[in-house]
Amino acid sequence: MSQMDPDAVSKAFVEHYYSTFDTNRVGLAGLYQEASMLTFEGQKIQGVQSIVAKLTSLPFQQCKHHISTVDCQPSGPASGMLVFVSGNLQLAGEEHALKFSQMFHLMPTPQGSFYVFNDIFRLNYA
């Protein structure tokens, strides 16, 4: 099996993740597994149901992510990937966008795709 291009994989993942987040947050469940962990603004959450419950309970219904940068690195012997994202988060009805950073540690699945093993999200305050 040929090695996938990490930059192409991370770009495709980021596009899929944020378009799903912006339109159908429940649909993110398929990207996580029971061992997955989300740290959202310092709060650690583990497992698919808990992560999706957190993401769907955020105090806004509509938002749009605008991605500024995507950096990735191969991670470890298991062919994982670290993906670091920065950008702006525009909430419906808000004049000013919020700046955010998010880091994903993607791990391969036996089916040849990736799942989110670690996910760390922070708003960046000026």
Curated annotation (Swiss-Prot):
Residues found modified as N-acetylserine: 2
Pfam families according to UniProt: NTF2
Cytoplasm listed as a keyword: yes
SUPFAM superfamilies found in the cross-reference section: NTF2-like
CDD domains with a match to the protein in the record: NTF2 (cd00780)
Segments forming domain NTF2: 9-123
Alphabetized UniProt keyword annotations: Acetylation, Cytoplasm, Nucleus, Protein transport, Transport
Primary localization class, coarse: cytoplasm
GO biological process: protein import into nucleus
Cell compartments where the protein resides: Cytoplasm; Nucleus; Nucleus envelope
Tissue localization of expression: Expressed in roots, stems, leaves and flowers, and, at low levels, in siliques.
Tree of life domain: Eukaryota
Thylakoid is among the record's keywords: no
Cellular component terms per the entry's GO annotation: cytoplasm; nuclear envelope; nucleus
Protein task: Facilitates protein transport into the nucleus. Interacts with various nucleoporins and with Ran-GDP. Could be part of a multicomponent system of cytosolic factors that assemble at the pore complex during nuclear import.
UniProt subunit comment: Interacts with RAN1.
Name the UniProt record assigns to this protein: Nuclear transport factor 2B
Species annotation: Arabidopsis thaliana
